[in-house]
């Protein structure tokens, strides 16, 4: 569907339209060429033209879709997180410190975790593991003896013993008791090894959370100890002489806290539990406030599911101030504050760039009239003329537009009935459909801008909208858009100095009707259509999916056997250039076949046998067989996505 001409448009208009000046700060802006620029170090300077960068990466045989990871942004996020807590600690005269950890589950990619460990050493920044495999990752990469290694998740004897033995490697693991039956395993493992880990307990808070992850707290939460279970755990540790090793209280109220009031309530409850644990004789020392530090996906700065009604500094201030208010009146030393802020750290540093392969839309063009058109087709032509000639007040026009659309639908049904009975040919049916959509387009163009619109008429814009076919798999690269209706910023990375004249949604490569993007960042509310530009046959149309660095890669799947995309790690160089630190090649067709236990060699051999049989039957020449097998071998080495 066309929305407007392209005159009188500026990059400021595009920034406002796509919310770039809200969610993009301080890393993404629009430059004078109408391209998105990336400032990986934020306000400290240095920028890269994203379109030029993609062009140069494609010149290095890194095809689209392409995942671009800016390691400078990862480091900058760490710096901002620690700076916020340092300011809060100074403002509230907090005598403790902040010591964060990165939850490995957010992004287990080796280069990502390595980068965080290296950048985080100056703050003794640690890692959080939620499984045995993640524990092994953390043990191999985390070499700072002062950094915390928080051990969460379900734990068997092997998990616990591995964590205990890690202390002898100079690590500082904290085994967090999340289920009552883990207490006895820790006691037995400690006796067997003659050593104990630092121990933590996770409390189930009664404070209610909101949003998509509200069930993370409360009596029915998946993890954590109820208050009676917490007291029983303390007594069991005391009986086993392990109470001196109880050092940490942990809670978690959701992956994306959208309302700061929820955090304040939880902090007050957890702060009092911490005080009571010290009164019961536990030395304590650490309070882990879990994850939940959200990011503003849609830039609205509200308590919506895709936003937050607080800033990073607000978050740090409330954590520091509330914990101090709980501890100081009770003469309890304030703890070292720990957070597992994976989403806030990792989301910004990674973006996916993909190209558009083509588009389609319903035809609203007006067919030429013929002398022997059926009555239903003539009725549709008359209805279109009526719509085009409407005048009067907005209220009166709206009533007449609804009446006209009702007429158009009736005439379309009459035409379909005539076709089914054999009274109408295919050309006349095509004319009836085109005229129906021409009526819809004329109505959509005339709907009042500032007036409540009947739902049926409001839906016409979506029905008329086009579909842009994107070279990606939603299930692989942005699974949360399908699974939980997560909003991500989706923006063309070029032509932003031109008015977008098309409304469309995005369909991916999979043979699945769910494989589409049809919820986009709007002005306060999600919108179903995205403003896009006309496609140019001579130049690729590039779109970016932003803020996708947390969870998306690891949760992506092999639906339709679309594999991982190419990925590249970029760092700014002095003088405004960049360097490529790592290239991670995406899956080939052979890779995904092997993942499903199809041996590419066996596959080729079967096809070779089939080709020989075709030669013997005279269906295939020898040179054609060779060309076919060469083509198949080449396909196995190629990416699972479409190429130029």
Curated annotation (Swiss-Prot):
What SUPFAM superfamilies does UniProt report for this protein, alphabetically?
Alanine racemase C-terminal domain-like (SSF50621), PLP-binding barrel (SSF51419)
**Binding locations of substrate:** 287-297
Q: What is this protein called?
A: Biosynthetic arginine decarboxylase
Superkingdom, according to UniProt?
Answer: Bacteria
**PANTHER family tied to this protein:** ARGININE DECARBOXYLASE, BIOSYNTHETIC ARGININE DECARBOXYLASE
Q: Which GO terms describe its biological process?
A: arginine catabolic process; spermidine biosynthetic process
| Alphabetical UniProt keywords | Decarboxylase, Lyase, Magnesium, Metal-binding, Polyamine biosynthesis, Pyridoxal phosphate, Spermidine biosynthesis
Reactions this protein catalyses: L-arginine + H(+) = agmatine + CO2
> Which species is the source of this protein?
Parasynechococcus marenigrum (strain WH8102)
GO MF annotation: an example: arginine decarboxylase activity
What does this protein do, in the record's words? Catalyzes the biosynthesis of agmatine from arginine.
Instruction: List every position bearing N6-(pyridoxal phosphate)lysine.
Output: 105
Which family does the record claim for this protein? Belongs to the Orn/Lys/Arg decarboxylase class-II family. SpeA subfamily.
Tell me, what's a Pfam family for it?
Answer: Arg_decarbox_C
For this protein, the Enzyme Commission number is 4.1.1.19
Q: What class of enzyme is it?
A: lyase
Q: Which residues cross the membrane?
A: none
Look up the record and name the cofactor or cofactors this protein needs.
Mg(2+); pyridoxal 5'-phosphate
User: Cell cycle: present as a keyword of the record?
Assistant: no
Lineage, please?
Answer: Bacteria, Bacillati, Cyanobacteriota, Cyanophyceae, Synechococcales
């Amino acid at each position: 569907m066309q929305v407007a001409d392209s005159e009188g448009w500026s990059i400021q208009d595009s920034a406002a339209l796509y919310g770039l000046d809200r969610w993009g700060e301080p890393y993404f802006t629009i430059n004078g060429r109408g391209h998105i620029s990336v400032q990986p170090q934020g306000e400290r300077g240095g920028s890269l033209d994203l379109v030029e960068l993609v062009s140069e990466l494609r010149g290095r045989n890194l095809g689209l879709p392409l995942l671009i990871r800016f390691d400078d942004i990862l480091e900058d996020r760490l710096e901002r997180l620690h700076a916020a807590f340092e300011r809060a600690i100074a403002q509230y005269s907090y005598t403790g410190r902040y010591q964060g950890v990165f939850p490995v589950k957010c992004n287990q990619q080796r280069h990502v975790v390595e980068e965080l460990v290296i950048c985080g050493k100056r703050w003794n920044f640690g890692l959080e593991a939620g499984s045995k495999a993640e524990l092994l990752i953390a043990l191999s990469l985390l070499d700072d003896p002062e950094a915390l290694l928080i051990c969460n998740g379900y734990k068997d004897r092997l998990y616990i013993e591995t964590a205990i033995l890690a202390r002898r490697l100079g690590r500082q693991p904290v085994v967090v008791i999340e289920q009552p039956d883990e207490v006895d395993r820790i006691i037995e493992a400690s006796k067997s090894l003659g050593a104990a880990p630092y121990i933590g307990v996770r409390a189930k808070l009664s404070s209610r959370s909101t949003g998509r992850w509200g069930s993370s707290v409360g009596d029915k939460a998946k993890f954590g100890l109820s208050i009676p279970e917490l007291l029983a755990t303390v007594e069991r540790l005391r009986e086993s002489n392990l109470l001196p090793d109880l050092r940490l209280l942990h809670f978690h109220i959701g992956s994306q806290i959208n309302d700061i009031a929820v955090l304040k309530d939880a902090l007050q409850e957890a702060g009092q539990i911490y005080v009571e644990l010290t009164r019961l004789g536990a030395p304590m020392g650490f309070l882990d406030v879990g994850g939940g530090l959200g990011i503003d996906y849609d830039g609205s700065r509200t308590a919506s599911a895709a936003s937050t009604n607080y800033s990073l500094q607000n978050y740090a201030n409330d954590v520091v101030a509330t914990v101090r208010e709980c501890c100081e009146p009770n003469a309890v030393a304030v703890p070292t504050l720990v957070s597992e802020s994976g989403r806030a750290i990792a989301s910004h540093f990674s973006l996916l760039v993909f190209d558009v392969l083509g588009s389609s839309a319903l035809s609203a063009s007006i067919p030429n009239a013929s002398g022997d058109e059926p009555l239903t087709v003539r009725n549709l032509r008359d209805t279109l003329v009526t719509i085009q000639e409407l005048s009067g007040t907005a209220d009166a026009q709206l009533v007449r537009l609804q009446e006209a659309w009702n007429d158009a639908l009736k005439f379309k049904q009459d035409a379909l009935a005539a076709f089914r009975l054999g009274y109408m040919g295919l050309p006349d049916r095509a004319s009836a459909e085109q005229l129906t959509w021409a009526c819809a387009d004329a109505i959509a163009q005339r709907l009042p801008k500032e007036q409540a619109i009947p739902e049926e008429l409001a839906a016409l814009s979506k029905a008329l909208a086009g579909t842009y076919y994107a070279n990606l798999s939603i299930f692989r690269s942005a699974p949360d858009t399908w699974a939980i209706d997560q909003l991500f910023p989706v923006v063309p990375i070029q032509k932003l100095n031109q008015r977008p004249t098309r409304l469309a949604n995005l369909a991916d490569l999979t043979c699945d009707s769910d494989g589409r993007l049809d919820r986009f960042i709007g002005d306060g509310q999600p919108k179903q259509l995205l403003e896009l530009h006309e496609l140019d046959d001579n130049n690729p149309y590039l779109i970016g999916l932003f803020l996708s660095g947390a969870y998306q890669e690891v949760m992506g799947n092999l639906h339709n056997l679309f594999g991982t995309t190419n990925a590249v790690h970029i760092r700014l160089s002095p003088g405004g250039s960049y360097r490529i630190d790592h290239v991670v090649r995406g899956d080939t067709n052979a890779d995904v076949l092997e993942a499903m236990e199809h041996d590419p060699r066996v596959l080729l051999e079967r096809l070779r046998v089939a080709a020989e049989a075709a030669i013997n039957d005279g269906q295939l020449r020898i040179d054609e067989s060779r060309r076919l097998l060469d083509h198949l071998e080449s396909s196995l080495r190629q990416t699972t996505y479409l190429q130029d």
